[in-house]
Every structure is written in C-alpha cells, then in structure tokens.
C-alpha cells in the first residue's frame, strides 16, 4: 500500500516543477526559423533576460545546460595560461574551476568549506598579494545547490575593489536567479550565467550568459574562443547566428511563457515568496533538529539559501528517507552530492512552488522521519504553518506586487536601457 498515486511532486533543486502554462506554451508545432514570430520570441527573451540579470550588457542563449554557460563564459573572455581564482563554497565553483583547467587555464582555489560561505576578507587579502595582476578572473557561485550556501556577492565585489584588483568577476547564478536579488550592473559583476531549469521554471536544455562591458572588452583578445560558444558569432546579422544553428524552438516557447509569469507576479513578489517559503522550511528543520540527528548543513544562518536547504542526517541512511518519501508518498527529495554524498538530503523551494506545495513536502519529510524511527523534534510542519501566518497576514485580496498582464508588468519593471539587437 502506498499513498503516491496522483501527481508526483518534484522537490529537488533542479530541474524544478514546470508550470502547466509553460508546458501548454510548448505544446505546438514547429515554426519557421528564419522569419516571423520566432524572431520576436528570441529578441523579447534576450531583452527580458537583461531585466532578470539587471544589466545593460549583452545576453546570449545556448542550447546547453549550465555547464555550457560556464564554458561560454570562460572561452569568451580568457586565454590559455591565464590564472583564475576559484572561491569554493560547495561543489560547483570547484567544478567550474576543473572545466577551466581542462581548457589550459591556471586554476587557484581558495581554501573552502561546504559549511561556511566565502570569506570576503580572505579574497581581499589574496588579491592584494597578487601585485603582478596575474589573476585574470574570480569565479564564484551565488548559491551552491550541493551545500545550500548563499554567498554575499556584493561583499565579494567590495573585497575585489578594496584590493584595487582588475580581475573579471564571474558569478554562477544558476541556483539563484529569479529566486533572490541579482544586480549584475549594480554589484559590478562582469559575467553572469544561469540555466533554464531552476528559478526560470523551464525544462532543462537552455543556458544563458550575460556579459558586461569589461567582459566584452576581454572577449576581443581571448584566444579560447570556439565557433559554437563565440559571442562574436552570436552577434551575427542573421537570427540563425543567435543559436549557431537551428533554434531550440519549443524551449524558447516555454521560456517566453515562464518570463511572462515572473513579470506578471513581479520580481519583488517572487523574491519575497521564495524568502518566506525558505524561512518556513528552516523553521521546520530547526524543530526536527531537536532530535539530535538531523541538522542544517550551513552553520551560518544568514548564509542559508532561499532556493534550497541541505540537511545532514547523522547515524541514519538518507537514502532510506528519500526512498520512503518517493515510493510511499510521491515526493522526490534531493540527494546529497559532492562531499555530502550519502550524508545529507536536500529540500528545494525554488521556482514554481507555493505554500501548499511546501507544506506537502515538509509533511512528507516529517512523515518519513516518523515512519523510519529517525529521532526528531515534533511539530516541524506546525512551525512552518506559524511562519506563513506571521509572514502573510490576510490582505483581503490579491497581493499588490503582482497581477496584471505580462506586457504591463514588463513595462513597469525597471528599465535597463539595453542596447538593441
């Protein structure tokens, strides 16, 4: 006997649940790729990605996952023998560094932890010591989905500036964009990368790079450029150049709808929704942790991400809990990865997710803990409910931060004065 019959819920940190409206937008025939409506879709997506990244720079769409965006960022701005400084806080910045090393880039990793965020003071000290200016770029992730750490990107930018260093600042926003503020121009970020399958609520298969003025200048002398990733090729005169071939039409249809949904809700409301859902999850975890077995992976409360929470489980097999949650209850939780393989599990609260979805997920986690006899404090779900009650008092109607047509919402969004296509 199981309780899983019905719609399975995906509570992993990517891919995330795809809204029905996005799926419906994709359910259509292929169309002409050289003229007509698809060109409007491409150019509107490129422009709205600038709004999401908050940049006046250029944006590029790749038929690739986030690792493709990593390679595009590196190959378009750096040359063989260049040195980069990798700021680890989990699995993914070091993995980006491994990719850089495979391209002939010299990689230096700062001492890092899965439990603490990047230390801006240490970054400043290392860059001050680089008096010859050998470090050409600093690589960091805003949110690492393995550890669930959120790094303070503005503070790292201030550290770079305090050191008087000219390195490019490259930020992976794959697990953060459209879940929390990301101010590319305001924070002095030179390159931002993300993927379609997390906060952007689109199926996997697209990745995006945003390039600022300094990155575009570095592109002119980069010798790692290859035909597919090359920004110069992507700026060619034909629509075909935007994708270096046939456009991924149906993913673009889905992306267009997902962007409409984000602007319709309003980005401030999107960020606040993620913050409240994350806080409710953390309230539940704090109660469960009273059992002495389950604990937050991230030891610094303010460095706990609003898109995913990683939980350590001491003395018990996380796989058993994940198996019960999926096979009995129909909720798929995230496995521990990297250094947390077989030691942790992850609860996602990103993208197309709301209060009943989170309460269902948290209820299944608490049910699984009880069913498997894993010691835990009682009342975690109630703590999450209390958080919702405190955070969202009855307003008597629809939240004023959202609503309206997608076109009107885009028009009301802060303009970025992006260059035309």
What does each model-identified segment do?
Residues 1-36, 419:
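N-terminal "arm"/small-domain region of PLP-dependent enzymes with the aminotransferase-like
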Residues 118-178:
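Active-site phosphate-binding strand-loop segment of PLP-dependent enzymes
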Residues 25-72, 91, 95-101:
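Conserved N-terminal alpha-helix of the aminotransferase class I/II PLP-enzyme fold
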Residues 2, 339, 343-421:
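PLP-dependent enzyme catalytic core of the Aspartate aminotransferase-like
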Residues 17-18, 197-284:
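Active-site C-terminal subdomain of aminotransferase-like
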Residues 78-94:
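Conserved PLP-anchoring active-site segment centered on the Schiff-base-forming lysine
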Residues 45-52, 260-297, 323-324:
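Conserved PLP-dependent catalytic core of the aminotransferase class-I/II
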């Amino acid at each position: 006997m199981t309780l899983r019959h019905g719609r399975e819920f995906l509570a992993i940190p990517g891919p995330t649940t795809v809204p029905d409206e996005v799926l419906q937008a994709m359910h259509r025939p292929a169309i002409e790729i050289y003229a007509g409506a698809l060109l409007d879709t491409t150019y509107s997506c490129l422009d709205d990605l600038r709004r999401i990244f908050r940049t006046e720079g250029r944006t590029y769409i790749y038929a690739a996952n986030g690792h493709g965006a990593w390679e595009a960022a590196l190959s378009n701005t750096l040359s063989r023998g260049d040195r980069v400084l990798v700021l680890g806080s989990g699995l993914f910045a070091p993995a980006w560094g491994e990719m850089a090393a495979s391209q002939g880039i010299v990689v230096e990793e700062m001492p890092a932890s899965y439990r603490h965020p990047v230390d801006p003071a240490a970054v400043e000290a290392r860059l001050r010591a680089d008096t010859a200016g050998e470090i050409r770029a600093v690589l960091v992730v805003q949110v690492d989905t393995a550890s669930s750490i959120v790094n303070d990107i503005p503070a790292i930018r201030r550290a770079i500036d305090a050191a008087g260093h000219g390195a490019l600042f490259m930020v992976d926003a794959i697990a953060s964009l459209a879940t929390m503020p990301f101010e590319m121009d305001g924070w002095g970020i030179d390159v931002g990368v993300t993927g379609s399958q997390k906060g952007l609520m689109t199926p996997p298969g697209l990745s995006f790079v945003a390039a600022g003025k300094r990155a575009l200048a570095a592109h002119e002398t980069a010798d790692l450029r290859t035909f597919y990733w090359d920004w110069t090729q992507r700026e060619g005169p034909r629509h075909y150049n935007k994708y270096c071939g046939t456009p991924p039409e149906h993913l673009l249809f889905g992306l267009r709808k997902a962007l409409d949904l984000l602007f319709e809700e309003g980005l401030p409301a999107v960020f606040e929704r993620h913050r409240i859902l994350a806080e409710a999850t953390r309230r539940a975890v704090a109660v469960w942790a009273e059992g002495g077995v389950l604990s937050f992976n991230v030891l610094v409360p303010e460095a706990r991400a609003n898109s995913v929470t990683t939980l350590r489980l001491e003395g018990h097999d996380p796989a058993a809990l994940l198996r019960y949650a999926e096979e009995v209850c129909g909720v798929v939780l995230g496995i521990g990865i990297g250094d947390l393989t077989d030691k942790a599990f992850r609860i996602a609260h990103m993208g197309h997710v709301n209060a009943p979805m989170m309460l269902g997920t948290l209820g299944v986690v608490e049910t699984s803990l009880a069913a498997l006899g894993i010691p835990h404090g009682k009342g975690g779900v109630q703590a999450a409910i209390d958080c919702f009650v405190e955070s969202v008092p009855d307003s008597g109607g629809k939240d004023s931060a959202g609503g309206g047509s997608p076109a009107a919402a885009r028009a009301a969004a802060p303009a970025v004065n992006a260059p035309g296509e």
